Amino acid sequence: MHPGGQAILFATDLDESSSVNAQLCELRKDGTMVDDSTQGGELEASEAGAEARHHWTELAQRILDAQDAYYARDAPTISDAEYDRLMVELKKVEDDHPELRTPDSPTQRVGAPQRITDFAPVKHLERLLSLDNVFTRDELSEWMNRVATAVGKIPNFLCELKIDGLAVDLVYRDGQLVSGATRGDGRIGEDVTANVRTIAAIPRKLTGDDVPRLLEVRGEVFFPVADFTDLNAALIEAGKNPFANPRNAAAGSLRQKDSRVTASRPLSMIVHGIGVLEGHDFPSQGHAYDKLAQWGLPVSPYFKIVEHVDEVHEFVTRWGESRDEASHQIDGVVVKVDDVSLQRKLGATSRAPRWAIAYKYPPEEVNTELLDIRVNVGRTGRVTPYGVMRPVTVAGSTVEMATLHNAFEVKRKGVLIGDTVVLRKAGDVIPEILGPVVELRNGTEREFLMPDHCPSCGAELAYEKNGDKDLRCPNAQGCPSQLHERVFGLASRGALDIEALGWEAAIALTDPENQRPGDDEVAEELPKRQTAVLSSEAGLFDLQLDDLAEIKVWRRRKVNGGPGPWQLEPYFFTKATAKKPSTPTATTKKMFDELAKAKSQPLWRVLVALSIRHVGPTAARALATHFGSVEAIREASVEELAGVDGVGEIIAESVKRWFEVDWHQEIISRWAAAGVRMADDRDEAPEQTLEGLTVVVTGSLEGFSRDEAKEAIVSRGGKAAGSVSRKTDYVVVGENAGSKETKARDLGRPILDEAGFRYLLENGPQGITTIG
């Protein structure tokens, strides 16, 4: 403890996955470790089995290498998730072979090693500890139970977001900022005072009349997610390597020799701990945060003090589903005992406090190999490059493809085929390739070249107008890729909702030879090419079961885990045998049932199904509500179309152009002849009881599916939102509502049950009774 100072055990928001936890020291060939900074540090590895010793050595070296890349070079070569996995595995080896666990082990060390750098060393007034991690809810509950047992009660907990940034220690004397240093090894860091002074969020002088004589605070410097893309674009434009993620951008921006470079970057900071403090004593973590804020220091707007264990889990759930709402990247939640006297009672181990824990979310960012970049032709002709990656699990699902949007985006991100790339997937968000791990390049990578002809039909690609970034295939009518994309799109839940008409079925109808092998891939002569049963979506509702009996698709079966021979197999019918004739599959029968039901779908769904560029469900609803029929929309002028609320000039011009194309008229006429509904009954239009209101539905309702609830809101003039904010007018909660209900209560938004929702739909907000 600093002389005359109060040592407050507020842990910093640091963990093994984002810090160096082992001293970089020499690993001997026999598995022992040499470290001149400790006495008796040699591991008695001879006592362990040879296999365990070898495994320990490999794991330790991988961790040390990862730490060196992460901290010394600000260029991580593995993901946080992979680092966590290695540490967990190393701990298990040491649990099984305790003789391998010494003070020199990566599992026992805290912080980054001291290396020769461009920055002077600075000794922290009070040592920075790390945090222990848990990865499951059961582990989190076990930790809270241990705390409750140790202190004799369930204490209040302070929950806060775990910032994925760079740890920094600040020292103020008589209210003036005198020092800023990186975390280093927890005792000694790097002097980055000049750079810290350029960060607007960090006050050079504390405010208030009672500023302490001496204050040491800890926090995280981070790069706002919203500014990350622009930074990388500027770096690539200048011929420099991009950063893999915002955390790397924060570290690289702060550890600059020239503070003017740091000043040019929009860094920010959040303070979450105190090392040394003179003249003040706080009863709780929450009180400390209040006072730090009064002194002008930036504290997190995302913390909450709770009284019950269930509330801790609710906080974890709420932010696990809303990670992208924070201004900074997060990879978990830190849970701390709020009462400082209980913190002191619980104490700390050599590396982490016992009164705080970090719950780690499943990783949203992982590293994987970019195997190839290919292009896809969409339903409106847009040609989109996408990355094909080595399959990897991220945010709970396996991902092997991610869009790259256009050639300009590929160049802006700076990715090459063969790169190790950082892949991000937040919840249900589409996977995104953030950028390359440049340090892992070996010279075999190659640049992606955008094709100049359509890979599906061979038409020359072109930009629709000057300034466009998207190349398009102009052969809308004859391009097989555009056709099967349109057929697949019209069957989606947001259009005609034909579940049995999926991606493969759409290809089988429009381009059954899509996967046809080359002559050199088969032993026998290939059969004659099939003719597609659909050359336009116009014929979709004229299809008969017999039309599909002979459709076959190419499949390549696996043999012993590897590629086997190509086979031509029936798609919509079963394969005939000596005992059973070929018959329609259950899915095929379901598809025809759903096609029949689709004929009665409301007008707005038919408009979406027509694949008019820019016309999605929102614009389609607006057009259907205003005009009431396809014929009225076709006859309307651009000015009349643009005058509809929610449409505008761009959509209006797109609609008008679509109706001017001859073969589009065939779609409308053949669908109408087949019985597809082309007009809404004007008497059916519900009263606009929700006009101007934003409603969020969460949980399961007995009388509505999720889509039905959304449609009920929109058809009555309301907006069906997917997340709760201060602008939300009502939140409807059903069974298992989850974090959205919690957030609604936090923000004081009116909450309705299903009965209240029905009342709102019928009568509007007048006289409604809320349940929260």
Swiss-Prot record:
Binding positions (Zn(2+)): C454, C457, C473, C479
Entry keyword annotation includes DNA repair: yes
Record key words, sorted: DNA damage, DNA repair, DNA replication, Ligase, Magnesium, Manganese, Metal-binding, NAD, Zinc
Key word Transcription present: no
Transmembrane feature ranges: none
MF terms (GO), sorted A to Z: DNA ligase (NAD+) activity; metal ion binding
CDD domains found in the cross-reference section: BRCT_DNA_ligase_like, LIGANc
Entry annotation: catalytic residues: K162 (n6-amp-lysine intermediate)
Essential cofactor(s): Mg(2+); Mn(2+)
A GO-annotated cellular component: cytosol
Residues reported to bind NAD(+): D80, A81, E82, Y83, D84, S130, L131, E160, R183, E220, K336, K360
The protein's role, per its UniProt record: DNA ligase that catalyzes the formation of phosphodiester linkages between 5'-phosphoryl and 3'-hydroxyl groups in double-stranded DNA using NAD as a coenzyme and as the energy source for the reaction. It is essential for DNA replication and repair of damaged DNA.
Family of this protein: Belongs to the NAD-dependent DNA ligase family. LigA subfamily.
Protein name: DNA ligase
Organism listed in the record: Cutibacterium acnes (strain DSM 16379 / KPA171202) (Propionibacterium acnes)
Gene name in the database record: ligA
